[in-house]
Amino acid sequence: MFGFLKNLLDDNARDIRRLQKTVDRINSMEPEWQRLSDADLQHKTVEFRQRLENGESLDDLLPEAFATVREASRRVLGMRHFDVQLIGGMVLHQGRIAEMRTGEGKTLVATLPSYLNALTGRGVHVVTVNDYLAKRDAEWMGRIHRFLGLQVGLIIHGLDFAERREAYAADITYGTNNEFGFDYLRDNMVIQPQHMVQRELHYAIVDEVDSILIDEARTPLIISGQANKPTEKYYAVARIIPRLTKDVDYKVDEKAHSVVLTEEGVSRVEKMLGIDNLADSLDWAHHVNQGLKAHALMRRDRDYVVKDGEVIIVDEFTGRLMFGRRYSEGLHQAIEAKEGLEIQNESQTLATITLQNYFRMYDKLSGMTGTAKTEEPEFMQIYKMDVVQIPTNKPMQRKDLPDVVYRTEEGKFNAVVEEIVQSFRRGQPVLVGTVSIEKSEQLSDKLKRRGVPHQVLNAKHHEKEAEIVKNAGQRGMVTIATNMAGRGTDIILGEGVAELGGLYVIGTERHEARRIDNQLRGRSGRQGDPGQTRFYVSLEDDLMRLFGAENIQGVMDRLGMDDSMPIESGMITRAIENAQRRVEARNFDIRKHVLQYDDVMNQQREVIYDQRKKVLNGENLRDTVFDFIDTLVENMVNRFAGEEKYVENWDLPAMLAYAEETFQIAVTAEDLHEMEKEEVIAFFQEKAQERYSQREQELGLETIRELERIILLRVVDSHWMDHLDAMDHLRHGIGLRAYGQKDPLVEYKYEAYSMFQEMIASVQEEFLRYMFRVNVVVAQAEEEKQEAEAEAEAETVLKNAVENRSDDSLPKQPVKAEPRVGRNDPCPCGSGKKYKKCCGVKG
């Protein structure tokens, strides 16, 4: 074990030594660069781009480019990159993760690789966790880039189409993970290529990379519209779930946050709902699954609150109320049914992608954070990125004290309050990290009773949050915050605080991941400042209750310790960290397993979006249309012929009617007399292709090519939306296959493939029906109308997608955007048809 750790440390040290040689080269250039005039320094950008065109690589330019950014930063911001920041910049350029402690200037580090990679002209995305940080960095660090002649863009909440397009056209674009992901989805819903805003996904630098690529990796970004689905099944399930018995009819795994029916439970549910086979009814299976989750896993006032007749989600990490946000996949409706509230309309998913799959599409991906090494295996396996620990600029002075363990939560919080009171009397600032809004308010009440003035950080805007966190290092300040609050904002010590021991960080509970605890510790001891940290733990905490409190409980019992007596030892701290390692490994396994399911959907999305992009960009579809005709004819003949060899035994009337309706060709039974199946197929293919060639002459080549493009995009989008819903139901019902001794993942892959093939066949059939039947007058009118509608719809989707989300990044629950017109709503064109059967499909 120690040999393995030694190798890891040696590898990191070797990396640093190797990069230090380049740092020495950059340092040797500094005197020469300092003598350059502003104009000469700015001209370096033009020179570098010319050298790239002449065949030099970015690696060739790196030392000079980094020297240029360092000197520009010194002149513009008065900030000179430290040597360790140059090393961090090189690590990011290599597509790796730079682990840099809090206060070491990660924001300034990002200017180095972003400038270098922007020289290619292909764009660089700098990704932050919220709008406040994106705006701050674009304005602050953007001054360096603008001085050097680069354009800087900003993607935040509330921008219109033109502003977004301009921001993405810039050399370097700052923005949040959610905004980048939503823009990608919206780009894959447009009808005209000029409505797209993003360029290719070239290079991304992800700030707080652990938060975005691990904590929120599976957060689905969803653009949705209302589906108006019936709600009776939610109420029916809500009535029967309370009649089921835990551990008999269903089993809850708190560690895995999952609930499953037992075989007995399946039988009881089938009987109570009056259905024969739950596994065969994906819709009922989906409702039961979500109902079980709502009743057994989702707790009122922890996971959500009920306010004014609505279910409001509580963010697990920050404790904020997520107004306007809803759980997806029917879970929100199931909770509404459980609470006896009016069920709001379920949403129809129009487009979706997880952050994990979005960021894996970049040609080069890098990230920075204060805490990543503990998750390196996951970064390597999922994103192919290793972690390099960057040395601090000044030696660390922070003292991390051993954990203190109490028998009860009440005993623990009393001890925390006592410790805060003592520190407050000394004038030493204290930052207390809690795991939930409930716990922070509980602690706040105790401090009020002791007369200790303090600030509580929850459900505040980022601007206010950053201000509170920034002031948390002032003398006598007591700040209570959720563990994740205030990331990206440095806590600077006030006058005289260093002499008092610096900022004292108290953790009131160990998180499942060591990384989250390390983030809290990292608020103290920035840039060589003094500081201290300690965690207070009770045997009633979730981590201790679920993972290994028995041994410590035994020790406390033998010693006859009461609630107010703690155990404090390095051995206890190590035991807790071992429990965390086990949880981390289990969580990684769960995420890997879930990713196997996600990858199936992701592969299908890539196929659809890739084909869609080719159509959007004006690829000639004539050959594609003729391939569709050949395939559909073959399917038609096989369907109506069945196993019969002779034409006389086929269902000829139905086949001929189908051919006339679909291909607009009149064929009689006599035309097929004495033909074999292959001859019939060839005959119909030739007839249909001839008819389509006539359509080309009737409509004109230019008109029919544009019609093909618009109609195919509409039909694909319509069927893709329905496919997303079907896949979602399949995903939630597939677990029941395990009762039949079948591997759910294998079954899911098989059925997903079959469903995808069926969707493709349906797309081809519906597309051809439109193309054979549309006439020239309607085509011209519809085309003009469609362009106007497409543009209006793009604006509506964009506006609503942004308006229905809050600014910050959200773990666990999906992030949604909802356009106004639902697919089952009446079409706004006034036809009287449903939108999905009218302008939601055709062009």
From Swiss-Prot:
ATP binds at Q85, G103, E104, G105, K106, T107, D490. It comes from the Bacteria. Gene3D superfamilies: Helical scaffold and wing domains of SecA, P-loop containing nucleotide triphosphate hydrolases, SecA, preprotein cross-linking domain. It is found in: Cell membrane; Cytoplasm. Keywords: ATP-binding, Cell membrane, Cytoplasm, Membrane, Metal-binding, Nucleotide-binding, Protein transport, Translocase, Translocation, Transport, Zinc. The keyword Translocase applies. GO terms for molecular function: ATP binding; metal ion binding; protein-exporting ATPase activity. It is an enzyme of class 7 (translocase). Residues 799-834 are annotated as: Disordered. Its EC number is 7.4.2.8. NCBIfam families: PRK09200.1, PRK12904.1, secA. Monomer and homodimer. Part of the essential Sec protein translocation apparatus which comprises SecA, SecYEG and auxiliary proteins SecDF. Other proteins may also be involved. PANTHER family: CHLOROPLAST PROTEIN-TRANSPORTING ATPASE, SECA INNER MEMBRANE COMPONENT OF SEC PROTEIN SECRETION SYSTEM. This is Protein translocase subunit SecA. It comes from Heliobacterium modesticaldum (strain ATCC 51547 / Ice1).
